[in-house]
Amino acid sequence: MQTLRIMDTTIRDGQQSLWATRMQVGDMLPILSKMDKVGYWAIESWGGATFDAPLRFLDENPWERLRAIKKHCPNTPLAMLLRGQNLVGYHHYSKEIVFRFVHAAHRNGIDVFRVFDALNDIRNIRDSAEAIKETGALFEGAICYTVSPVHTLDNYIEYAQGLKDYGADTIAIKDMAGMLTPYRTERMVKALREEIGLPVHVHCHYVGGMAPANYIKAAEAGAEIVDTASAPLAFGNSQPAVEMIVAALKESGYDTGIDLDLLFEIADYWDEVRERNHLKRGVSSLIHMQVYSHQVPGGMMSNLVSQLEQQNAGDRLDDVMKEIPKVRAEVGYPPLVTPMSQIVGTQAVLNVLSGKRWGVVPSEMKDYIAGYYGKAPGPLAPEVVTKVLGDMPALEPDVWPSELVTTTYDEVAAEAGDLAHSEEDVLMWALFPNEARTYLSKHRTSEKTEFMLEEEYLGTKEDETVDINQIKELIKVVEDTGIGEVTVEEAGVKVTVRAKGEVAYAIPAAAAATEAAPAAAAAAAAPSAAAAATAAPAAPDSARPANWIAVTSPMVGTYYSAPSPDAPDFVSIGDEVVAGQSLCIIEAMKLMNEVKAEQMSVVREVCLENAQPVEYGSLLFYLEPITS
């Protein structure tokens, strides 16, 4: 028997699974020093959706976030989730970008890289594995666990051997959908220990409730590490609560040795954050228990709910949950993990909301079916392949998708121009060019940091004062971490230290949080200054010829007139288009969804400006049919 080690997932997978990755770094920093004292094997703090979500929704720089976390956790290794050739994005990147990103992540604070490929295609692990071994960081190779007619224990062991051959230091079983059961866990852990011989790390989502029993069986079978979250961010779609697992193993041969009282202090803090921001606890409902049917992972579930609400279609969740297994079977049973969870989930949403199965297909789904994400685990439905690809050729089986991506760092740096002031800025642009452009333009500055001090008297006593040493400490936090603003309240006075010229995130004082929260929420929800007003749904129009066709948006999202910022528009007024020709892109649910002409026509009106938000049914174009 050996002590079971714990990796904490609260500030990465916990919040991604329950809070749609909307936790601000200011909510994290006050508690990190206590988390650093727990004795975790590692704190998972970065990667997954915690790179693009802060950039996209919170106006935060993910690199600054990582540096700030590292500053407050000097004693505990920081871990990240890396999507192999996809890094923290949603498609393949070139070998050079992969190597530079891994080195930058390590340089900024990452000690443990958990690497997975959504298809368990070992080819998509090679570049990141080589880069990690160069840095000297720990390389944890992850198996995406799922249940399907084409996934077997032998497949998983063969894949684990491939990870070992690439230099993996540990093997993780990544049960992102909560599909593992106690006896499946026992068999898989034993097989990995006996046949691969590396330390085994088990990652389960609570979902249907079996995860704690899985962890007990995993420990008994020889697993060394499991993943948990602090109770306020545990259960439901997230991981089991650390307090539960630590208590369960007390006085056993697997006793973690972790102080429960310290864990409860940390949990009290996270519960305050949850209440202050009006966020939900993790719960297991009937739809969660049905995971053994729909196989939807925790993070995917919370995002699906959020996305359907954005589409004003929250009542269609049951329909989407029934559609997901159908789509998954038609495209070869990919494990539902990023980016495949987004690709399959979005296709299911589009099938349901449009009323036409496979009528609207995101470009990412088309690329997957063509083989550009890697090899599908099982056979694809021929009728779907024909409908989606048409005349587009599929990739030959012996071609490695990653070798087709040749974008260089210098090319990205040239595109970013003087908006990028560091390698990290360029890498951010390489992964998310539109979001990076918006963020870097807004925060453009090359001046030496100066500090501004704001003071607001809130007290009731005339003799209340603020300790000057505390102000010095606030300045030190801003200076050392790169965070733009820190606010605390003490002795009836609220003090804010702000880096001049920066618009960043604040650490809310507990007493001032209720007052500050609505403003913060409004700021997070507001569109960028450059964005136009959201286009309204189409209304009947008798001013145009009766034969003109109104093309409307099939979803809520952002309208893009061109495939990339520097490319020409798909169409212009007066252009003739044929059936199936792309008219524009609607970015929604992190995917690019092409809107196509349904018949030969002439473009008579373009109704929107580029990058304008749209609602479901918003007018995009008027087309005049061409009759022979």
Which sequence ranges carry the predicted segments?
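Active-site mouth loops of central-metabolism enzymes
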Residues: 10-30, 81-97, 116-119, 142-155, ...
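Structured functional modules or segments
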Residues: 521-628
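Acidic, compositionally biased tether/linker regions
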Residues: 445-552
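Catalytic cores of alpha/beta
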Residues: 154-159, 208-221
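Hydrophobic faces of well-ordered beta-strands that scaffold small-molecule active sites
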Residues: 6-9, 41-45, 76-83, 113-114, ...
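Terminal or standalone catalytic/regulatory effector modules within metabolic enzymes
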Residues: 36-54, 285-291, 295, 299-466
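Active-site beta->alpha loop and helix N-cap motifs at the rims of alpha/beta catalytic domains
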Residues: 47-159, 164, 178-182
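Conserved, mostly hydrophobic/aromatic
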Residues: 14, 35, 115, 171, ...
